[in-house]
Amino acid sequence: LIAGHDKEIMLMKQVKNGKVASRQQENREQGFRHYMSEHFPKVKITELDIPAEESNLGYGKKLESFFSTHPNIRNCITLGSKAYIVGEFLLKTNRRNIQIMGYDMVEKNAQCLRKGSVSFLIAQHAYMQGYNCVDSLFKAIVLNKKVDPTNYMPIELLTKENVDFYRRTQL
């Protein structure tokens, strides 16, 4: 974990109408908190809610306020696909001492990864996930076969050194 010796880390959450924007984010947060409580119980997780409908100016104000209030935070995790919100803010404000871990290989996240404002991205092979869903539906509906309700998928940890070698469309 990038925050091994820190006392406090930031958890950025995308919210819509005051609630976490997706079930996926909710599940990731639950797993993250469980992991942290078992392995790093003394690390305080400080949340920052970012409304999905906010403007870039609004994001900047929220982030400036957050980092002014929490000057010792050096690590951030985002559980949605918008790590670039923090990454772009760090570039604009020339903050080079904060690491961000995010999800999803979207182009803006990849740009921030290449520039060094995002440290890591977890990529999840969306094409493979989609293929496996359709395959399971076919087996269940057409072939009348029982399908496993759990489908574990590989992930990849992307850094600026390997991001250009990631093949997102590979099955």
Features from the language model and the residues they span:
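Short beta-strand elements at the ligand-binding edges of bilobed clamshell
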Residues: 1, 115-127
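Short beta-strand segments enriched in small/hydrophobic residues
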Residues: 7-20
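Short beta-strand elements in bilobed, periplasmic/extracellular small-molecule ligand-binding domains
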Residues: 10-11, 33-56
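Short hydrophobic segments within beta-strands
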Residues: 11-14, 77-78, 158
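Hinge/cleft segment of the Venus flytrap/periplasmic-binding protein
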Residues: 19-20, 36, 125-171
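Short, solvent-exposed amphipathic alpha-helices that sit
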Residues: 23-43, 85, 129
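Hydrophobic alpha-helical
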Residues: 32, 51-108
